[in-house]
Amino acid sequence: MIIASNNKGKLKEIKEIFNDIELKSLKEANINIEVDEDQDTFYGNALKKAKAIYELSKEETISDDSGICIDKLNDWPGVFTHRFLGEDKTDRERNLAIIEKCKDLKDRSARVVCNIVYYDGEKTVVGEGVIKGKITEEPRGENGFGFDEIFELKNGKTLAELNSEEKNEVSARYLALIDLKNKLN
């Protein structure tokens, strides 16, 4: 099965959950393609990627899309979390821009939403995970990637302040993977 990603952090998380299946990254499958994530839902982006990779490989594919939805900003940045500043920006630059956008908000409540799609050319199965928390006032933590350093859980820690085992128990991707795995079994 192919994971429609080369993101090392994402691959590690997925391989830890689906540890009983042989999984390949795009690089390991010798696939070099960028799929334009232009859909207006996480599900739409994940499905588009999964179908594109399947068409090239004819192998079962799992693909995900995720992002932060800030309640008081009408769920911004949502599906644009990784792209709202442009593809050439770092995680830190994006995170600082999100913090800046939230600076005047009294309520910084947010959700991380993750949709993971399995596609085999005929069957489409989606797993969804959602976690609630808030946007921090500054980045915190060294573990993780993406927006992990600015998303604070109800326990007061950011996702980046958790070790990988702790994060795997609470992350939206973990919840989506478990949901997907249960639906596939």
What are these regions (language model features)?
Residues 1-2, 9-185:
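Anionic-ligand binding patches
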